Each structure stands twice: as structure tokens, then as C-alpha cells.
């Protein structure tokens, strides 16, 4: 009898202690007060979906989402080569959910690296997946809002990988030493002022100075796309969880306060490709791009580009003697055509403009991606602008000056010279810098080197084409855009030659505040996806009354002595 009484008393005491613990638990979390508030507000509001209202009310008191897993998958980029997709999973309201993913393609500083075998891409993707698996426990429990902290962790993780890759390559060089490359022999040319055949005896000759040797290209570490893809995926996860468009999230990372007006980047749209991979003799124009006049919307710009492109196709078909010409498309998303003269692609565009009622230099401008680093013949020490036609770095300056004098609608030259030809870059800046943008793409330092140097003066250019590839983090992108603006240069956000399918580049361009965006042409899906995203962003800004327009093209002052500036556009209001 006494045993039963004692057992009942023990159970009663345990129930009492449990009730006290529950009361203390709910008291600490203010559950009873918030539950009372929720019930009162629900009764007063009388929502149609009572449980939906209660769910929304209590959601504001839930813990912030945290990363619970990072996963990597092998996917294909826009050219069918393997790359890596980084997926971010977060714990949201006690549930593990897949939030988003991102894909970026690998790109090399070396022009020939893009021609590597498929097994190298496979190897890089496999390593990237392993890196993402290794990074998963390091990021577990962190908030996607901690972009700077996560990017620093990624950079710290990546730094030893660079050293390992350098050591591996050094060991390979020591094991199988490469033969020394022959230095280009000095080139002789007639003395200035001497005409061929003038005077008696031998003609005086001038020995041209040998070109600077090619700099050692920055090594691309296999697996590096894992870093850039994961950094972007974290930014996307934060924007998804906060229900904020990615471009607004990026701008918030850049500025403490969001601006009241956003300026859409002006698209540089690829129309033709006449580079080293195209048929015909012409090598100089890897891309011929159009730049719409200021004051136009992205929609108006794309409509104009599409109209011009269709007219060019008609002209090519009309000139073909065998019926409609086969439309070869470059990975850049534009038509690949042959040319035998430097002016030939420009003449084709001029003729198309006349047919559709557009005026070059008024409605639209031209840009040329020269990709000079792909034209250099190191044995001759000259650029092969046409098959069998070679130009020294000094002669290239005369070529560009003459070309722009004959076609003043050319607004920009991309990579007109190698980065090593710094003296000629300075001469070109003096000759054309006040009326033509001189952009460095492959001629620019890598993003990490730009941030280390804190300078945009090598080479002296109007601005830089920045691409989100390999190990570049979102924080580094923010830093390099701040540097470009601080140096009063022009920022261009571009895509690599082999681009992945995704539209985040458009958000990055708007969020980072790029003046121009270079996405390629309109003939490949991975390119048009990004243009479509630009259109969607423009529509959102229009609906919000926050869309602004550039009113003129301003050229940075590159040197103390420059030629007179080119024609300015009349400001427009829309």
C-alpha cells in the first residue's frame, strides 16, 4: 500500500516538474505572448486563410536559414564541355531544402588553353566536385547572408591549391624540359623618308626593336570553377531566401543604401566574327559588335540588332551563287564569315544599315574585338592581321588610326594590342583615347592581380572587360568594380568564349553597375538567355519607376596629351 502511494507521489512530482519545465521553456521563447498576439490579430483581421495568416505571423520569429550542405554535379556548358554546378542546401524552419544552384565555365588567360582536350575539362570538373564536397562541412551552419566571410573562406581554401599546382607544373618542367623558344629575329624595314628604288647603291635600313616576350600566362588550376560557382550560388541563395532579385541583392552588397535609380548597362551585341577561326584571309576582327545609341531601352537595342542581323543574312544569301549560304555560328553567338579585306565586314554592316534605315554614328556605333594576342607571330615579331600580311606593333597604331578616320562610327576597340606592348598602348591612347574606348580583355591583368596592384594603368586603357570565371568570388567582383570606378575607368562585364547556360550574368551586370555588358550574339541559346533576363530586369525597373538612361558616352582621360574628342551624343530623356 505504501509502495503504491509513493509511486503515485513520484509520478505527480514528475508531472509537476515537467509542467514547470514546459512553462519555463515557453516563457523564455515568449511563445504564450506571441500566440495570444497571433490569435488576437487573426480574429481582428478575419483572413480568408486563417492558417496561412498564422504561418506567416510565426515565420518572422523563426531562426535564420543556415547552410546545411553543398553539393557538386557535373553538367555541360554551352559548347557541350563538362563543367561543375554548385548546389546550396539550407535548413529553413527545421527542414533541409535545396535553395539554388549556379554554373560558371572555366576560362583561361592563355588564348590557346580554350582548345584543350575534353579530358582536361572532365578532370577539372571532377576535382571541382571533390572541392565542393570538402567545403560542405566548412560552410555548414553559416548564413548565406555572410557573403564576405564565406568568400574569404573560399579564398583561403583555394590559395594552397594554387601553390600545389605551381609545384606540380614546376616538377613537370624539370622532368621533361621544354626546348627554348627561338627569339624573334630583328626585322629590317626601310629608313623613314626613303622611297623604294630611290638613289643609288643599297637602301638604308632600320632594324626594328624586338617585341617584348610573351608573359607567362596565369595558370588555371583544375577545379577552380568550384570557387566562383559556389560564391555565386551563396549570393543567389541569400537573394532567394530574402525574396529579393539577385541584382538588388548584389547592389545591396555594394552599397549600404540602394539607389533610387538604376542604369541598365548598354549591350555590346556581337554581329559578325572574322577572326583566326573564320574562313577567308581576315584575322583582325574576332568580333564586330554594335553599340546602340544612348537613351535606348534594352528592348529597343535588341530589336535594332535583330533587324540588322536579318538584313545581313539577306545580303549574304543574295551574294551567294549557290543559293542560301550556310549560316555558320561562332560560340560567341554571331555569324562566322570570311573576309579578304579589313574593311569588308564594316562595309557589309554599313550596307545593311542603309537598307533598314539606320545611320552609323547616330543610331548605333561599332566595336571591334581585335583579340591581338591571337594574331601575334612570335617568329616574325608581328601581328598577322590578314593571312600573309604582317604588322609590327607600331604599324598597328597607324592601322587603327586610319581605320577609325575612315569609319568614325567605331566607338571601341577591344584588345587592340598585346598586354606586353605597353609603349604602343600609350601611343594608341594618345592618338585615339579621346574618341574611342580602348578596352583590355585578355590584355588585362587577372582580377586578383588588379586588386593586388590597385591600379588600372597597365596597360593604359579606357577600361577592362571583367568576366566571372574560375576562382573569382562575388566579393572580388565588388572590389574590382570599385577599383575601376575609383580610377575613373569604364567597367564592362563580359562572358567567356565558352559560356554556361544561366542568366546570372545579367543580374551581376546591373547589380555591379557595369557601363557596358558583353554577352555575345543572338544566335545561341546560352547567350539569349542572358539577354532575356536583362529584358526582365528592365521591365521590373520600369514598373518600379526606377529605370534611368545614359545620356552620353564619356571617354576617360588616359594621358595628358590626347587628340580632340569625338562627337558627343545629345542627351535624351525617355
Curated annotation (Swiss-Prot):
One of its GO terms (cellular component) is phosphopyruvate hydratase complex. Residues 193-203 have a biased composition (Basic residues). GO terms for biological process: glycolytic process. Keywords: Glycolysis, Lyase. GO terms for molecular function: magnesium ion binding; phosphopyruvate hydratase activity. InterPro entries: DD_ENO4 (IPR047500), Enolase (IPR000941), Enolase-like_C_sf (IPR036849), Enolase-like_N (IPR029017), Enolase_C (IPR020810), Enolase_N (IPR020811). Residues 165-221 are annotated as: Disordered. SMART domains: Enolase_C (SM01192), Enolase_N (SM01193). Pathway: Carbohydrate degradation; glycolysis; pyruvate from D-glyceraldehyde 3-phosphate: step 4/5. The active site is at residue 467. Residues 179-189 have a biased composition (Pro residues). It is an enzyme of class 4 (lyase). Belongs to the enolase family. This is Enolase 4. It comes from Xenopus tropicalis (Western clawed frog).
Amino acid at each position: 500500500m505504501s509502495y503504491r502511494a509513493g509511486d503515485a507521489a513520484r509520478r505527480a512530482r514528475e508531472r509537476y516538474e515537467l509542467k514547470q519545465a514546459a512553462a519555463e521553456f515557453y516563457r523564455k521563447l515568449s511563445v504564450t505572448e506571441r500566440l495570444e498576439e497571433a490569435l488576437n490579430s487573426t480574429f481582428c483581421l478575419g483572413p480568408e486563410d486563417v492558417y496561412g495568416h498564422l504561418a506567416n505571423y510565426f515565420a518572422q520569429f523563426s531562426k535564420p536559414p543556415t547552410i546545411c550542405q553543398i553539393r557538386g554535379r557535373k553538367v555541360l556548358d554551352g559548347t557541350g564541355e563538362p563543367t561543375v554546378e554548385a548546389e546550396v542546401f539550407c535548413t529553413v524552419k527545421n527542414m533541409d531544402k535545396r535553395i539554388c544552384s549556379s554554373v560558371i565555365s572555366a576560362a583561361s588567360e592563355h588564348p590557346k588553353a580554350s582548345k584543350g582536350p575534353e579530358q582536361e575539362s572532365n578532370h577539372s570538373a571532377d576535382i571541382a566536385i571533390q572541392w565542393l564536397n570538402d567545403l560542405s562541412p566548412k560552410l555548414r551552419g553559416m548564413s548565406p547572408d555572410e557573403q564576405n566571410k564565406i568568400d574569404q573562406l573560399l579564398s583561403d581554401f583555394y590559395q594552397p591549391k594554387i601553390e600545389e599546382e605551381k609545384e606540380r607544373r614546376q616538377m613537370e618542367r624539370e622532368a621533361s624540359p621544354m626546348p627554348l623558344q627561338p627569339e624573334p629575329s630583328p626585322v629590317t624595314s626601310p629608313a623613314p623618308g626613303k622611297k623604294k628604288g630611290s638613289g643609288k647603291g643599297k637602301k638604308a635600313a632600320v632594324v626594328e626593336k624586338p617585341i617584348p616576350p610573351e608573359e607567362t600566362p596565369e595558370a588555371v588550376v583544375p577545379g577552380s570553377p568550384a570557387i566562383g560557382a559556389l560564391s555565386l550560388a551563396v549570393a543567389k541563395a541569400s537573394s532567394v531566401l530574402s525574396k529579393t532579385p539577385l541584382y538588388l541583392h548584389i547592389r545591396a552588397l555594394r552599397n549600404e543604401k540602394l539607389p533610387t535609380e538604376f542604369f541598365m548597362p548598354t549591350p555590346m551585341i556581337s554581329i559578325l566574327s572574322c577572326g583566326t577561326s573564320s574562313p577567308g584571309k581576315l584575322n583582325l576582327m574576332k568580333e564586330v559588335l554594335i553599340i546602340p545609341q544612348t537613351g535606348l531601352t534594352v528592348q529597343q537595342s535588341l530589336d535594332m540588332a535583330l533587324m540588322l542581323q536579318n538584313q545581313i543574312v539577306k545580303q549574304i544569301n543574295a551574294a551567294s551563287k549557290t543559293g542560301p549560304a550556310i549560316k555558320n555560328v561562332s560560340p560567341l553567338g554571331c555569324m562566322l564569315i570570311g573576309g579578304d579585306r579589313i574593311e569588308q565586314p564594316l562595309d557589309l554592316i554599313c550596307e545593311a544599315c542603309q537598307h533598314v534605315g539606320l545611320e552609323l554614328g547616330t543610331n548605333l556605333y561599332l566595336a571591334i574585338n581585335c583579340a591581338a594576342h591571337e594574331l601575334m607571330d612570335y617568329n616574325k615579331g608581328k601581328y598577322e592581321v590578314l593571312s600573309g600580311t604582317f604588322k609590327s606593333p607600331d604599324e598597328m597604331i597607324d592601322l587603327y588610326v586610319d581605320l577609325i578616320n575612315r569609319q568614325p562610327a567605331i566607338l571601341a576597340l577591344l584588345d587592340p594590342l598585346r598586354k606586353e606592348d605597353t609603349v604602343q598602348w600609350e601611343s594608341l591612347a594618345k592618338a585615339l583615347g579621346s574618341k574611342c574606348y580602348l578596352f583590355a580583355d585578355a590584355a588585362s591583368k587577372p582580377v586578383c592581380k588588379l586588386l593586388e596592384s590597385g591600379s588600372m594603368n597597365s596597360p593604359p586603357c579606357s577600361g577592362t572587360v571583367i568576366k566571372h570565371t574560375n576562382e573569382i568570388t562575388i566579393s572580388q567582383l565588388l572590389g574590382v568594380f570599385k577599383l575601376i570606378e575609383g580610377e575613373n575607368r569604364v567597367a564592362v562585364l563580359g562572358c567567356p568564349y565558352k559560356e554556361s547556360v544561366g542568366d546570372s550574368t545579367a543580374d551581376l551586370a546591373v547589380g555591379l553597375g557595369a557601363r557596358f555588358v558583353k554577352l555575345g550574339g543572338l544566335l545561341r541559346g546560352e547567350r539569349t538567355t542572358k539577354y532575356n533576363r536583362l529584358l526582365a530586369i528592365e521591365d521590373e525597373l520600369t514598373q518600379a519607376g526606377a529605370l534611368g538612361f545614359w545620356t552620353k558616352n564619356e571617354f576617360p582621360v588616359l594621358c595628358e596629351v590626347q587628340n580632340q574628342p569625338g562627337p558627343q551624343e545629345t542627351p535624351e530623356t525617355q
